[in-house]
Curated annotation (Swiss-Prot):
Domain of life: Viruses
Keyword Electron transport: no
Organism ancestry: Viruses, Duplodnaviria, Heunggongvirae, Peploviricota, Herviviricetes
Protein name in the entry: Envelope glycoprotein M
Keywords for this protein: Disulfide bond, Glycoprotein, Host endosome, Host Golgi apparatus, Host membrane, Host nucleus, Membrane, Transmembrane, Transmembrane helix, Viral envelope protein, Virion
Assembly with partners or alone: Interacts (via N-terminus) with gN (via N-terminus). The gM-gN heterodimer forms the gCII complex.
Intravirion side: 1-32, 112-137, 185-216, 272-280, 340-473
Protein source organism: Human herpesvirus 1 (strain 17) (HHV-1)
Amino acid sequence: MGRPAPRGSPDSAPPTKGMTGARTAWWVWCVQVATFVVSAVCVTGLLVLASVFRARFPCFYATASSYAGVNSTAEVRGGVAVPLRLDTQSLVGTYVITAVLLLAVAVYAVVGAVTSRYDRALDAGRRLAAARMAMPHATLIAGNVCSWLLQITVLLLAHRISQLAHLVYVLHFACLVYFAAHFCTRGVLSGTYLRQVHGLMELAPTHHRVVGPARAVLTNALLLGVFLCTADAAVSLNTIAAFNFNFSAPGMLICLTVLFAILVVSLLLVVEGVLCHYVRVLVGPHLGAVAATGIVGLACEHYYTNGYYVVETQWPGAQTGVRVALALVAAFALGMAVLRCTRAYLYHRRHHTKFFMRMRDTRHRAHSALKRVRSSMRGSRDGRHRPAPGSPPGIPEYAEDPYAISYGGQLDRYGDSDGEPIYDEVADDQTDVLYAKIQHPRHLPDDDPIYDTVGGYDPEPAEDPVYSTVRRW
């Protein structure tokens, strides 16, 4: 006799070996989500405690960029330079942003676990497949490792073990890059990814909104944090190199700039070449790259200001080259952002996606609102010139026209006041001509015609005079 099937199964067959494996994988996935949530909460709480008990975290919250005790004379003569460090605000800000993003991804994983059960009759295997679309096992493992490595970095800095802390942070950065890339791709091809996401539109709309639009927004935020961490990663690599090799002060600046440029350019090419096929609209990486460029530039300027004489003595003009290189990195990031937005727009317009339709509707609504605002402003300006209620009407504008005709007994341009338009005097036939002559008689002189006063002129009568039709004056 077999054990009865669990409630909600599509058939009453006993559980097979495949169903048992699916249930085990489902519970393993749930445990991974729980551990990821705990690790994200722990790293966030550690940063909060470090901000409260600053005396217990001296190297983490102290002013790390103080180079006052450095012997500049030895450096000028060719001694080993002091490693370049970030200021406290940049270091702590980067760590806090990373912890907040990890916590947001943990919350997203919990929401994905809840929405994965889009049908009550869903078995463990299908629910596990839906949950993996939110976050696979490898992504959860990478997220756990990122959180714990960041906590170890903070604790090592608190105990002033600087070299080991920088090494652990480099490992944390590498794990964070893998975590963000795997979160974006889920470890599948882009065609498979799109088919799986689009297949949930009709089957599970709520879960589709989680693994579709919400995932795209979170991917942008996570990649922004990754590119923001490139500044700390470059400084950590530069510090490790300074501990193992003899660098001068200009060499320290140049090494940091080269490492940072390599990291940013490489990651931007990966975003444009691989990740853009999964999420078309990606603006977070480029914003993070520009912000990281500012962080590195600020650290270089602070280092150059404190060691001005050393840098200018050993390598004059090195800081100018560093500034130009950082400016080129920022310009490259902005250019890639423009390219990404252009390609995303062309893709959505070519395929007529819902995102493009919504953007077009938003643009039309914005234009309509702008037109309404302009018309209301124009109406308010016209209302200022309108007469107040109860005031006598003003003279119309056409009354000043010299060719205007007034009716109703008013004077026209000829001074007539008979109340009829002037064009009524134009006759159409002989009867109207005669009536017009009687109504408006003309006083003609009774004198002789003008031709009689011309001396010596006596016109001879003709049988058919030419001027017989001309009225005699």
